[in-house]
């Protein structure tokens, strides 16, 4: 029970220090990274010990404090330690520690350094409290606390209008899901009379067996519970907050998209799976939402120019795979993919942060420029360690063996054939799209030449950028008109440009290299002509996550053909429900696995090959810019191809028009209603009052 509260002293002490000793606390601000990392490391040791106990004994530990208010009602609080809890605790602590170490250097220049670490530690506390909750009331309390922390971190740079709007958007979107979650919790309490998971599952199963419940009402309550997971895990149609959440600092993006906020929805569905399994319509609904999100996220990622938004849509698609697996009843595959994806995606986000950090020395603090992949390119020469790390994370997400995501995604793809051939075809096709858009991000960022110095060529004939679109080396003028980010004014300033600091370079010279931890004063960030590799404090977490990306997939591999349950993950999840694997247990062997693996890897390589053809280095030869435009030929086939590209580009660029629909329908109608209410209040209500007052003069 002490696990959630171990990181809590850090935000409390920072708050007290800023209140009582603000000057001293700010002077020693870099000191607070150490206790944050230390306390989370202690939690990681506890979580590792619990995980080992789970693997060895398959025990489930529950401790409950009961507070009896009267004979009819008692409030129970407690902690539940089972395989799901231990898996999530390990994820939160390991990813959290790497992000905290990384943030010490990444946020060193920021005036909100102390506030950042206070939020991060409280975020870890809230998430650990959520995964150890033993009842729905505790789940809801910590659910809201995690939401509060994520809103604070998304809007961390709240003076930027985009960040403030993104924070509000995330808040409003999640309010919809959270309200549904609350109604669902109250509905199941009305049905069963209990909030405790064990009692809830047992009572509900008995009611279903004895046919003592209204199936329509039960389905409605389950759908409301699922609405909370849909919003938090950015599933269709409540996914619209996710790309805007990229306005927060990059370490926050890594934490939110790897192990915390977006994992909440998957955790909730996994925790309540015994409840959902006895309601077939809900399981079908979960898998339907999952497969829609898989395809939608992949198509929206195809033409993103912002490196973080591209990774955000990738996260959305991968979460769809997990939700699809849960809807199919493949509990083990869903959690396996949650584990492997967390480390790979954290690696990708921290790698992108390293790239952004190095680009800021050239373009200044301007997210529109420093995160724009069109202005990158050729970074493999300047940031080699980051490049290798990012490439490994990319290949893992593409599903290339023997990296982590290959093993888990392959399980989900194979299970989808047992569930529905239509869903399987969509899932396999999206695997190819995943390889395409992930390798596109890698090629635009690291291959070719540094494009930031060629932005003056854009939009004019007979120049390199005339026929360069976000789709690769060539396209029609029609697409180029939409390509606004190529025409960025290089002289535009940002609010934060004058408030950006950099560690003292002299200490690096005295130490003979990059310092591992900088406890020094700060000065203005110096402009450079070319990017440079990040400090060791930022590279060390990348190397740790590379190791997990390489080896964590072996948790779920069974090296014995006769028994599937000899792998570590199956022992870990022994008491859990896994419907599809019970059906397919006898069919699973190395021959079947190799046959499916060869097919999935072939699809992934096809996506990589297509991305390489479209996005291979554009400036391989500068001798004749007209050569780049030479393949743009007129004709019916080319015209048809341009129309398809334009359609796909507009679909991705406009976010499938879902944001536009929400803005015109919901936002517009609410504003219209508010204006009507305002008119009625000022003209009618106030008019009656004022009219009576005026009439009194004539009476």
Swiss-Prot record:
It is an enzyme of class 7 (translocase). One of its GO terms (biological process) is ATP synthesis coupled electron transport. It catalyses: a plastoquinone + NADH + (n+1) H(+)(in) = a plastoquinol + NAD(+) + n H(+)(out); a plastoquinone + NADPH + (n+1) H(+)(in) = a plastoquinol + NADP(+) + n H(+)(out). One of its GO terms (cellular component) is chloroplast thylakoid membrane. Keywords: Chloroplast, Membrane, NAD, NADP, Plastid, Plastoquinone, Quinone, Thylakoid, Translocase, Transmembrane, Transmembrane helix, Transport. Pfam families: Proton_antipo_C, Proton_antipo_M, Proton_antipo_N. PANTHER family: NADH-UBIQUINONE OXIDOREDUCTASE CHAIN 5. Belongs to the complex I subunit 5 family. This is NAD(P)H-quinone oxidoreductase subunit 5, chloroplastic. It comes from Digitalis grandiflora. The gene is ndhF.
């Amino acid at each position: 029970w002490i696990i959630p509260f171990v990181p809590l002293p850090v935000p409390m002490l920072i708050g007290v220090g800023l209140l009582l000793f603000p000057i001293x606390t700010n002077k020693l601000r870099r000191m607070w990274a150490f206790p944050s990392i230390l306390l989370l490391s202690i939690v990681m040791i506890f979580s590792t010990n619990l995980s080992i106990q789970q693997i060895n004994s398959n025990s489930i530990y529950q401790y409950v404090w009961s507070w009896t208010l009267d004979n009819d009602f008692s409030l129970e609080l407690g902690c539940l330690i089972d395989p799901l809890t231990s898996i999530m605790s390990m994820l939160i602590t390991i990813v959290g520690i790497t992000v905290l170490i990384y943030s010490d250097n990444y946020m060193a220049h920021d005036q909100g350094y102390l506030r950042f670490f206070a939020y991060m530690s409280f975020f870890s506390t809230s998430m650990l409290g959520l995964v150890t909750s033993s009842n729905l009331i505790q789940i809801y309390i910590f659910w809201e606390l995690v939401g509060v922390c994520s809103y604070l971190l998304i809007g961390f740079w709240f003076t930027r209008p985009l960040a403030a709007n993104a924070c509000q958007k995330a808040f409003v979107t999640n309010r919809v899901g959270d309200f549904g979650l609350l109604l669902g919790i109250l509905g199941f309490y009305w049905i069963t009379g209990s909030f405790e998971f064990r009692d809830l599952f047992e009572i509900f199963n008995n009611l279903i067996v004895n046919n003592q419940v209204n199936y329509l009402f039960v389905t409605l309550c389950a759908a409301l519970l699922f609405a909370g997971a849909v919003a938090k895990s950015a599933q269709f149609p409540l996914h619209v907050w996710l790309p805007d959440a990229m306005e927060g600092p990059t370490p926050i993006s890594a934490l939110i998209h790897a192990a915390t906020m977006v994992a909440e929805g998957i955790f909730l569905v996994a925790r309540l799976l015994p409840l959902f399994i006895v309601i077939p319509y809900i399981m079908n609904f979960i898998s339907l939402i999952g497969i829609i999100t898989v395809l939608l996220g992949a198509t929206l990622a195809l033409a993103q120019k912002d490196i973080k938004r591209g990774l955000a849509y990738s996260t959305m698609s991968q979460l769809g795979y997990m939700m699809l697996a849960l809807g199919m009843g493949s509990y083990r595959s869903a959690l396996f993919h949650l584990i492997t994806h967390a480390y790979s995606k954290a690696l990708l986000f921290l790698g992108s942060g390293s790239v952004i950090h190095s680009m800021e020395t050239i373009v200044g603090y301007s997210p529109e420029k420093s995160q724009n992949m069109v202005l990158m390119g050729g970074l493999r020469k300047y940031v080699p360690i980051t490049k290798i790390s990012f490439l490994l994370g990319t290949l893992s997400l593409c599903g290339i063996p023997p990296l982590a995501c290959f093993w888990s995604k392959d399980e989900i793809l194979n299970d989808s054939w047992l569930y529905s051939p239509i869903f399987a075809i969509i899932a396999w096709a999206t695997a190819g799209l995943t390889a395409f858009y992930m390798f596109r991000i890698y090629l635009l960022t690291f291959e070719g030449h540094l494009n930031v110095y060629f932005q003056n060529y854009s939009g004019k004939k007979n120049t390199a950028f005339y026929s360069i679109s976000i789709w690769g080396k060539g396209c029609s003028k029609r697409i180029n008109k939409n390509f606004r980010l190529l025409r960025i004014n290089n002289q535009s300033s940002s609010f934060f440009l004058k408030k950006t600091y950099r560690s003292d370079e002299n200490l690096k010279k005295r130490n003979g290299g990059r310092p591992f931890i900088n406890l020094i004063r700060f000065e203005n960030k110096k402009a450079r002509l070319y990017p440079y590799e990040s400090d060791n404090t930022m590279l060390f977490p990348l190397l740790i996550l590379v190791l997990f990306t390489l080896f964590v997939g072996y948790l779920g591999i069974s090296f014995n053909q006769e028994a599937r349950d000899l792998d570590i993950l199956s022992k870990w999840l022994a008491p859990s429900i896994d419907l599809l694997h019970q059906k397919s247990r006898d069919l699973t062997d190395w021959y079947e696995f190799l046959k499916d693996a060869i097919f999935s890897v072939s699809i992934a390589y096809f996506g990589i090959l297509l991305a390489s053809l479209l996005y291979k280095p554009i400036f391989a030869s500068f001798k004749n810019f007209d050569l780049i435009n030479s393949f743009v030929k007129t004709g019916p086939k080319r015209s048809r191809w341009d129309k398809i590209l334009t359609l796909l580009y507009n679909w991705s660029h406009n976010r499938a028009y879902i944001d536009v629909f929400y803005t015109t329908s919901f936002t517009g109608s609410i504003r219209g209603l508010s204006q009507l209410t305002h008119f009625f209040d000022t003209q009618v209500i106030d008019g009656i009052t004022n009219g009576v007052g005026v009439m009194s003069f004539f009476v």
